[in-house]
C-alpha cells in the first residue's frame, strides 16, 4: 500500500478514532477477528457505513471472515499517526478546563496538553494534572509557533480576541467550548462544541422522537 494517505470524506475521518478505540479494547481482550456487524453493535454505526468507511483504504477484510483485529489496529494506528504526539495548549482553567487537565486525554497516545493559560493570579504558577498554568500575558512567549492545537474554555466575550492572538502564533486547530462563533482565516480549522446546545438537542429528541423500548 502506498504511504500517501487516501483522501477520505470528513464524516469518515471523524469516525476513525471511534473505530480505533474499540479495536484497542478488542485487542486487549485477546480477540483476533471481528465482523462489521460486531463493530456496528459496539460503535453504533450501521454495518454498511463501516464497510464503506473501510473501503476507502482498500481491502482491509475478507468476505466471510471479517477483519483481523491486529491488522486493523496497526493500520489505524498509522493512519491516525498514533505514534506522533501532538502538543495542545488549553486556555481557561475553570471547572471544565481543570477537568481537561486532570484527564489530559489519557486514553489517547497522540494528544497531550502541555501548557495551560489563565488570568486568575491564584491559578497562575500552579500545576493542574501535572500541566503548568501560565498567565495569559505570556501566550506569545510560551507558544512561539510550536503548538498546533488550542482548547478554549474561556468566557465567550474573551474568545475572539484570544483566537486572534492564537492565529498569529501559528495555531492550526481550535477546539472551542465557548458559545462564541469564531472568525478565523480559511486555513484554521475550528470545531465548536457547545454543551448547552447538545443538552438542549438531547432533551428535544427525547421528548419528540422517543426510541422504542
Curated annotation (Swiss-Prot):
The keyword Cytoplasm applies. One of its GO terms (biological process) is response to redox state. It comes from the Bacteria. GO terms for molecular function: DNA binding; DNA-binding transcription factor activity. Coiled coil: none annotated. Keywords: Cytoplasm, DNA-binding, NAD, Repressor, Transcription, Transcription regulation. NAD(+) binds at residues 92-97. Pfam families: CoA_binding, Put_DNA-bind_N. The keyword DNA-binding applies. It is found in: Cytoplasm. Residues 18-57 bind DNA. InterPro entries: CoA-bd, NAD(P)-bd_dom_sf, Rex_DNA-bd_C_dom, Tscrpt_rep_Rex, WH-like_DNA-bd_sf, WH_DNA-bd_sf. NCBIfam families: PRK05472.1-3, PRK05472.1-5, PRK05472.2-3, PRK05472.2-4, PRK05472.2-5. Homodimer. Modulates transcription in response to changes in cellular NADH/NAD(+) redox state. This is Redox-sensing transcriptional repressor Rex.
Amino acid at each position: 500500500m502506498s504511504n500517501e494517505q487516501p483522501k477520505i470524506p470528513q464524516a469518515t475521518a471523524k469516525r476513525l478514532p471511534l473505530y480505533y478505540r474499540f479495536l484497542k479494547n478488542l485487542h486487549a481482550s485477546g480477540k483476533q477477528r471481528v465482523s462489521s456487524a460486531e463493530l456496528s453493535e459496539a460503535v453504533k454505526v450501521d454495518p454498511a457505513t463501516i464497510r464503506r468507511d473501510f473501503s476507502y483504504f482498500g481491502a482491509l477484510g475478507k468476505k466471510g471472515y471479517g477483519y483481523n483485529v491486529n491488522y486493523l489496529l496497526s493500520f489505524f494506528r498509522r493512519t491516525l499517526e498514533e505514534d506522533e504526539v501532538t502538543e495542545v495548549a488549553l486556555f481557561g482553567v475553570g471547572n471544565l478546563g481543570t477537568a481537561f487537565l486532570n484527564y489530559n486525554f489519557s486514553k489517547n497516545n497522540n494528544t497531550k496538553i502541555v501548557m495551560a493559560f489563565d488570568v486568575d493570579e491564584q491559578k497562575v504558577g500552579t500545576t493542574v494534572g501535572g500541566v503548568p498554568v501560565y498567565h495569559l500575558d505570556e501566550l506569545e512567549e510560551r507558544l512561539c509557533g510550536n503548538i498546533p492545537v488550542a482548547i478554549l474554555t474561556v468566557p465567550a466575550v474573551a474568545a475572539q480576541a484570544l483566537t486572534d492572538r492564537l492565529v498569529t502564533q501559528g495555531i492550526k486547530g481550535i477546539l472551542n467550548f465557548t458559545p462564541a462563533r469564531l472568525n478565523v482565516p480559511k486555513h484554521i480549522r475550528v470545531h465548536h462544541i457547545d454543551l448547552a446546545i447538545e443538552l438542549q438537542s438531547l432533551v428535544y429528541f427525547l421528548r419528540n422522537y422517543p426510541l422504542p423500548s
